[in-house]
């Protein structure tokens, strides 16, 4: 059972800092829980975690992702979190972060704003109902019944849910300046900072997504994002050569986002795990370091001429 406080502050940043880092709000994955986030080392800032308030009763969200986002906005406001925040999460948590950020663009004078998105192995999403068959997920029978029911409820939503319609790239698609590993980089639009396994940061070119914005569409600019990408595919119990649903873009640096969505991911870090063991004990120290690297990028990221 999760704490009644929702969101719950799971880390507190240093009170001695002259300029306190932007707080981070992490959103649960499809399990509905936030236990994995409690296991992380210090992220050097205030960190909050939102669990699914429907978890204990296994109640599905009848209004889908839109209802969830609206409710979580109220939770963040009620917790007294104000001003600029970073928003993110593992897997489904990344999708919810993007949905919340999109909902905020339609609110006049919101009490908080999303200045960056942290995606932890959240691949580009296409509704399951529109995709060809894929390999089954691993056997989850060893997990508690409430967790398995939560997986089932979110699978139903993901079967038809589509990503919110952002119409403009992050930071107006301008060349940016940001810090990573204590160094400063200048990164042009259409390029990202990328850290492959066992290597340092590289400035690499990505595929471009062409979005013909209609004059009738509202200009909705994405927040910049940083991505943790699992480098391994999920082991399966079958002889199928098809990947699991979450591994459809495993071979791509940005997990399918660059060729299917307006440009918003500014940095990507590879981690030598698969989607379902990224938070296991032996991987936590490395993952914490990599998350801090991504947070450094998001803290420092700004268009040339503005920083």
UniProtKB/Swiss-Prot annotation:
Keywords: Antibiotic biosynthesis, Hydrolase. SUPFAM superfamilies: alpha/beta-Hydrolases. InterPro entries: AB_hydrolase_fold, Thioesterase. Its EC number is 3.1.-.-. It comes from the Eukaryota. It is an enzyme of class 3 (hydrolase). One of its GO terms (molecular function) is hydrolase activity. GO terms for biological process: antibiotic biosynthetic process. Disruption phenotype: Decreases significantly the production of KK-1. Pathway: Secondary metabolite biosynthesis. Induction: Expression is positively regulated by the KK-1 cluster-specific transcription factor kk1F. Pfam families: Thioesterase. Probable thioesterase; part of the gene cluster that mediates the biosynthesis of KK-1, a novel cyclic depsipeptide with 10 residues which is a promising active compound with high activity against many plant pathogens, especially Botrytis cinerea. Within the pathway, kk1J is not essential for the biosynthesis of KK-1, but plays a role for efficient production via correction of peptide chain synthesis by kk1B. Belongs to the AMT4 thioesterase family. This is Probable thioesterase KK1J. It comes from Curvularia clavata. The gene is kk1J.
């Amino acid at each position: 059972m999760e704490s009644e406080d929702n969101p719950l502050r799971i880390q507190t940043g240093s009170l001695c800092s002259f300029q306190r880092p932007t707080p981070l709000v992490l959103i649960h994955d499809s399990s509905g829980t936030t236990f994995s986030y409690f296991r992380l080392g210090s992220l050097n800032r205030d960190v909050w975690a939102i669990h699914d308030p429907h978890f204990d009763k296994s109640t599905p969200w009848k209004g889908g992702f839109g209802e969830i986002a609206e409710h979580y906005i109220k939770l963040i406001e009620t917790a007294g979190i104000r001003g600029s925040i970073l928003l993110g999460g593992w897997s489904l948590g990344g999708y919810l972060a993007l949905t919340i950020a999109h909902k905020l663009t339609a609110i006049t004078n919101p009490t908080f704003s999303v200045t960056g998105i942290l995606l932890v192995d959240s691949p580009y999403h296409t509704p399951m109902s529109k995709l060809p068959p894929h390999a089954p997920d691993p056997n989850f029978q060893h997990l508690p019944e409430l967790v398995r029911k939560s997986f089932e409820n979110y699978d139903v939503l993901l079967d038809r849910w589509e990503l919110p319609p952002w119409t403009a790239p992050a930071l107006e698609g301008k060349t940016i300046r940001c810090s990573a590993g204590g160094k400063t980089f200048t990164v042009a639009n259409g390029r990202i900072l990328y850290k492959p396994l066992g290597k340092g940061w590289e400035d690499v070119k990505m595929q471009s997504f062409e979005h013909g914005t209609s004059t009738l569409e509202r200009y909705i600019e994405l927040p910049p994002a940083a991505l943790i990408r699992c480098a391994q595919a999920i082991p399966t119990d079958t002889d199928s050569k098809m990947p699991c649903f979450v591994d459809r873009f495993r071979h791509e640096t940005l997990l399918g986002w660059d060729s299917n969505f307006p440009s918003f991911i500014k940095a990507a870090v590879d981690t030598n795990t698969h989607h379902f063991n990224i938070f296991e004990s032996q991987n936590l120290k490395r993952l914490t370091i990599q998350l801090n690297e991504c947070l450094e990028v998001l803290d420092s990221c700004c268009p040339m001429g503005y920083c």
